[in-house]
Amino acid sequence: EVDAQGMSIPIEMYIMADGRQITNMEVMGMSMSQDAFDGTDVWSTNFMTQSAEKADAEESENKLRGIGEYPSPLLDYADKGYTVELMEDDVVDGVDCYKLKVTKTPLIIEGEEVENVEYYYFDQESYIPLKTESEMRSGPEKGGMMITLYSDYQEVDGMYFPFSLTFKTEDSDGQLIELDTIELNPVVADDFFNFPTEE
């Protein structure tokens, strides 16, 4: 569930290895989808009109360029054409961390290719990621860092996942998402992620 301005919103997130994804939620009795990607187009439900709307071609292209990053850009990173550089050690909430710079496939912003870098902070004792950072390339906070904090790691089918994620900027408290359950390899219909069409 998401904590949004003191209101708890139940959500379901589906993420597939081939890049398809969708976040479904119910807000004040209305069902909607956000951050959906069907393998070709990014789309979301407009909060005001309750209609599904496709994102611009640039956003969809950038999502296509990131296919293969799940569950982690570091997994087989060289095969993806990414590079990883060990930076100077850092500290996250009092925990000594290794800091990695991951350079990924460039993004397209306003028609131009720009560097796509993400920084990872790994606990030096447990080797679990505690934080990631990447530069925001558009919008009112362009140039600032988007920060994701990971905590409450729990084991699911022999692997550890963070059940608490906070998405924030350097100047904000951020958005907390707390997961109740994680199910691996659920059965999902092929058209589950598709942009809805009018009947």
List the model feature ranges, each with a label.
Residues 19, 80, 116-118:
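A generic structural signal for short beta-strands and their flanking turns/coil linkers
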Residues 28, 93-195:
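Gly/Pro-enriched, hydrophobic low-complexity segments
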Residues 1-49, 83-88:
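N-terminal mature ectodomain segment of secretory-pathway/periplasmic proteins
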Residues 11, 34, 53-55, 99, ...:
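Short capping micro-motif at the N-terminus of alpha-helices
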Residues 36, 41-113, 139-142, 188, ...:
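Flexible, processing/modification-adjacent segments and terminal tails
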Residues 1-2, 9-10, 21-23, 29-31, ...:
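Intrinsically disordered, low-complexity segments enriched in polar/charged residues with Gly/Pro
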Residues 2, 7-11, 48-52, 62-68, ...:
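Generic detector of short, locally flexible boundary/turn motifs and exposed helical patches
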Residues 13-20, 38-40, 58-61, 152-154, ...:
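A short, sequence-level motif marking secondary-structure junctions
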